[in-house]
Structures are given as C-alpha cells and as structure tokens.
From Swiss-Prot:
Residues binding ATP: G328, H329, T330, G331, S332, G333, K334, T335
Organism: Caenorhabditis elegans
Similarity-based family: Belongs to the TRAFAC class myosin-kinesin ATPase superfamily. Kinesin family.
Domain of life: Eukaryota
Membrane-spanning segments: none
Keyword Protein transport tagged: no
Keyword Signal included in the entry's annotation: no
Pfam families (UniProt xref): Kinesin (PF00225)
Coiled-coil annotated residue ranges, if any: 19-66, 89-118, 170-248
Protein name: Kinesin-like protein klp-3
Cellular-component GO terms for this entry: cytoplasm; microtubule; microtubule cytoskeleton
Subcellular location: Cytoplasm, Cytoskeleton
Polar residues bias (residue ranges): 136-150
Gene behind this protein: klp-3
Kinesin motor domain segment(s): 245-565
C-alpha cells in the first residue's frame, strides 16, 4: 500500500496535462517491467516444478522397476507450488494497485486540465530554464523505449526518471515552438518583401501619375495666370487712358503770413465745380481755367496729396514709363510738393516707398530691383547730383527707342533709410541762387529717376519701368526777377526749355508727324514719358499772392494747353517682356476720378 500511496502522490504533484501524460507513460512502462519480472519468476518456478516432477517420475520408475526401495521428494513439489501460488497472488495484488493508480491518475489529469487555464505556464518555463539547460544533455541520453532489464540490473529510481522525462518533454515542446516561430518569421519576412515590392511599384506609378497631373495643372494655371494678368493690365491701362494719359492737377499754395494782411487770395476754387479755378484781382484782371482733373485744396496735407497721385505709380509697376512733374513760378510750392521737409516728406520719397511696399506684398511671385538716379538740367547741361564729377552727360537712344544717359550713377536702394540718404545727398548738390522772387530759387530742372526692374518668377518675364519725378525750375518772367549776368543766362535757359516743352505738347495735341523732342535736353529726357503709352501727371502750382497774378495766369494757360493732349498709344518699340505683369489687385489701386472739362 505504501507503493500505491507514493504513486498517487506523484500524480498529485502534476500541474499540467503533459506532466500527467508523462507520469502515465512511465507508470505503464513500470507495469510492463513488473509484469516481465513476475513472468520471469513464474517461469523459474515452473521450471523448478518441472524439475521436481521429472525427479519424482524418475524415482517412481526406479521404485516400480525395483531399482529403488522407497518413493520421496513430495515436499519440494509442494514448496514450488506454494511459491507459484504466492507469485500469482502477488501478481493479482499488483494488478489491483495498478488499476487504482490508473483511476487516480485519470482524476488528477482532469483536475490539472481544469487548472491549466489558471496557471502561468510561461512563468514556470522561465523559472526552470537554467535547470533545463543543465540537464538537457543528460535528458537527451534517456532511452526513448525501455527494454526489459535482466533480473539482476538496478532500475533507476522512479522520481528521477519522471524528472528526466518531464525535462525532455519541456525541451521538445520548446524546440517545436522555436521551429514554428522560425517558420512564421520566414513567412512574415517574405510577406514583408513582397509587400515592399508591391508598394514600390504602386508608389512609382502614383509618382508618375502625380507628376503628369501636376505638370498639366501648373501649365494650365500659368496660362490662366498670364491671361488674367494681361487682362488686369489692359483694364487698368484703359481706365488710366479714359482719365487721360496726360493729366493735370492744380495745387493752390496756402497764403503766407505776409500775404494775409488786408488781402484776399487771387486764386480760388469755383464753388460749383471743384475742377475749376478763378484767378482775379481787384483791378479786374480775371482768368477762369478749364476743368482740370483735380484741384487740390490749400488745406490738404502732404499725405493727402500723395493719396491723390499714387494710383499712377501702379503703371510704373506694370512696366510703363511714368512722369510726375511740378510746374509753376518761383515761390508757388513746387519743391515743397516734390521734396518736402524731413518731418513731412513729399512725393519723391513717398513714391519710392510705395514701390517698396508693393514689392514686399508680391515677393512670392516677383523679384524686384529698384535703383535711384538724380540729375539736374542746368543751362542745358546734364549734371549728376549723386556724382558731382559727371558735369556734362549726354543723352543716347537705345535700340528699343528708350532714352539713355551713359555714365549716370544709379544707386540700388533697399530700405527707407537708404532712400532718405540718397535723396538728401543729391539735394544738397543742386544749383540754387537768390533772386527777387525767392531767396533760394532753383536754377535748374531737378529729375529723380527711379528704375524698377521686376522679374516674374512664375512666367520668367521681365518688366522694366521708369518713374521720373521732375521739379521744374521757376517759370517767372525775367522782368519780374530783374536778373542780370549769370542769373539772366540761367533764366533764359529755363524759359527756353519750358517753351520747348510747350511746343512738344502743342505738336502732340495737333497729332503732328514730327514732335520736336530734340530741341532741348528737358524734352529729350521726358520723351518716354510724353510719347506712346506712357503716363504723365502735371501738378501746376498757383500762388494766392496778388504779386504773382500774371505768373498764375501763365501757369493756367500752360495747364490748359497740355491738358488737351491725348497721346497715341503703341508708337514706342518695346521688348516682348515689357507687357509682362507684376500684378496689383484692384483693391490696392486708387484711381483718380476725372472731372468734366469745359
């Protein structure tokens, strides 16, 4: 019974089904060994009985034949039969114990099967990993089948045999898991390679399709962009032309403190039409102007004045030549309008700053290069105000029909500080002199030329525009200034150039075939701004002082003469890229409303 209890304890120590199976297999092997041993003992007992029977038969023969006097050895046979019966009894008892053990094993196997889901098999494997590694070699040497041992051999202790077989089962199971994982890894690797190849093929096809689609899309987009830019330019140009390629503004200077004593201004704006001015005095001299494009009131600030003239600068951005010049007699406020003091800069600096702002708004599509040059026409000689060593420059005409001045210094500007410094440097070099009309009278025509080169990064087209900002010398009569000597010579040169400017305007008004641009340096320089599709704005300055009555009337006459000119477009030869657009939205442009002319 102790052996039976030990077998039950072995089954109870099993925690997993595979351990129960191993124990069951080993018990079966032990049963076989026990049966073999029992059969061997039975065979030996039978041999002993046979020997005893043979001896007994021999004794009986001897006794019958008279060779022996008595018959013996009965006790030996009974002893053999007793031993054989005892062995059979032992065999039956062994079978009973084995049956009980098998029944108990089935119960334990069922319990372990129910508990298997709650056990952490991986934890048990990890805790025994080192022990398996140490006993692997010895486990592998355990024979897979147990052959019957001779009766005299020593059988390995049962617990040690169970432990060896348990470890061998663990090792085989781990090997199978490792082989399965390796197989799955190889399959996943092949699947990954196949997926990668398929993905690369798909991406290549997608890339080709996207490249084709993108190329077509951008081609259509650029074509539409060019068409829209051309249409916008045409509309803007038509609007400017409707207002007149040459436009005329009047600006009436405010009265000075010395002019307000018991004196009414001789120049006033018509109460019914703000595009008409009246020039009159108490003696009956009177002049009423024809309708101008705009009359700037005396209370307008420098900022308000620039807001009125800024739309024409858009044409310069689009590649047209633009000229804004101030006309009037000495003391009427021309230089104040164009230059202005440091605290209230005039049109020159504000116009260049507007170009910077426009360039900044469109830096994504347009690359701009802005250069500034300053010159004066003094006694019909062109002097470079930024390089005083250039005192007598010549005018040349390019193959495209543009006027060019070789040797004129052009300074690239990139900030407001550079613009201010450049204009101040040129301003201090211009020619001035004291006359009876003004203590610091400009004795030359001062021209600030701004060159705007714009390259469209999308269309690769280039636009070149010129902005001429002209402060004309005083238009007063020689008799009023009482000039003599050098001042007289300067006044005669000034009046001659202004007269030739009037002749050019008259020829344009009459659509003459020959326009006398070459009669003076001023008209030659301004030829691009007066001819073809260029845009010109003339600000005629009038003084409310009674002493300047005749000069104001003369200025009004000049304004009426040039205000009736309508230039013919398309007479200039231009590069194909001249029409490329740099683009300004309609919301950013302010157009100057035209007033009806009388």
């Amino acid at each position: 019974m102790d052996s039976h209890v030990g077998e039950v304890d072995i089954f109870q120590q099993c925690k997993y089904i595979h351990e129960v199976e191993l124990v069951n297999m080993k018990l079966q092997m032990r049963i076989l060994e026990t049966h073999i041993e029992t059969k061997d003992r039975l065979l030996r007992n039978l041999e002993d009985i046979i020997d005893e029977q043979e001896s007994r038969i021999a004794n009986m023969e001897d006794f019958i034949q008279g060779r022996a006097t008595s018959y013996t050895n009965r006790s030996n046979m009974l002893k053999g039969i007793s031993v054989l019966s005892l062995d059979f009894g032992n065999l039956s008892e062994e079978n009973l114990r084995l049956k009980n053990a098998l029944s108990q094993m089935q119960k334990v196997a069922r319990v372990n099967e129910l508990l298997e889901t709650d056990e952490d098999y991986e934890s048990d494997m990890t805790s025994n990993e080192d022990r398996f590694a140490l006993s692997r070699d010895s486990s592998c040497s355990v024979p897979r089948s147990v052959s019957p041992q001779p009766t005299g051999d020593v059988i390995k202790p049962y617990p040690q045999m169970v432990q060896s077989m348990r470890e061998e089962g663990h090792w085989k199971k781990l090997q199978r898991c490792a082989e399965e994982l390796k197989t799955e890894k190889d399959e996943l690797k092949r699947l990954a390679l196949d997926t990668k190849d398929a993905f690369n093929v798909c991406m290549a096809e997608m890339r080709m399709m996207l490249t084709s689609k993108t190329t077509d899309f951008f081609r259509v987009l650029i074509e539409r962009y060019k068409a829209e830019m051309e249409k916008r330019k045409q509309l803007h140009n038509q609007l400017v032309e409707l207002n007149g390629n040459i436009r005329v503004f009047y600006r009436i200077r405010p009265q000075l403190a010395s002019e307000t004593d018991n004196q009414k201004p001789v120049v006033v704006i018509d109460e019914m039409d703000n595009g008409v001015v009246h020039v009159s005095n108490t003696t009956g001299t009177r002049k009423t102007s024809a309708g101008a494009d705009k009359v700037i009131p005396t209370d307008f600030s420098q900022d308000q004045i620039f807001n009125e003239v800024s739309p024409i600068i858009t044409s310069c951005i689009d590649g047209y030549n633009v000229c804004i010049f101030a006309y009037g007699h000495t003391g009427s406020g021309k230089t104040y309008t164009m230059d202005g003091p440091v605290t209230m800069p005039g049109i020159n600096q504000r116009a260049i700053m507007q170009l910077f702002e426009t360039a900044k708004e469109r830096t994504g599509d347009i690359k701009y290069d802005i250069k500034v040059a300053m010159m004066e026409i003094y006694n019909e000689k062109i002097r470079d105000l930024l390089n005083t060593s250039n005192t007598n420059l010549a005018i040349r005409q390019t193959e495209e029909g543009r006027s060019s001045i070789p040797g004129l210094e052009e300074v690239s500007v990139n900030s407001a500080e550079e613009v201010t410094e450049t204009l101040a440097r040129g301003r201090k070099n211009k020619a001035v002199a004291a006359t009876e009309a003004n203590i610091e009278s400009s004795r030359s025509h001062v021209i600030v030329r701004v060159l705007v080169s714009a390259t469209n990064l999308i269309t690769k087209a280039t636009t070149v525009g010129r902005l001429n900002l002209v402060d004309l010398a005083g238009s007063e009569r020689v008799s009023q200034t009482n000039a003599t000597g050098q001042l007289l010579k300067e006044a005669q040169a000034i009046n001659k150039s202004l007269s030739e400017l009037g002749n050019v305007v008259l020829a344009l008004r009459q659509n003459q075939k020959h326009i006398p641009f070459r009669n003076c340096q001023l008209t030659r320089i301004l030829e691009d701004s007066l001819n073809g599709d260029s845009k010109t704005l003339v600000i005629v300055h009038l003084s409310p002082d009674a002493k300047s009555l005749n000069e104001s009337i003369s200025s009004v006459n000049f304004a009426e003469k040039i205000g009736q000119v309508f230039t013919k477009s398309g007479t200039m030869k231009r590069e194909p890229t001249r029409r490329s657009m740099t683009g300004i939205s309609s919301g950013q442009r302010r157009e100057i409303p035209a007033s009806p002319r009388k």
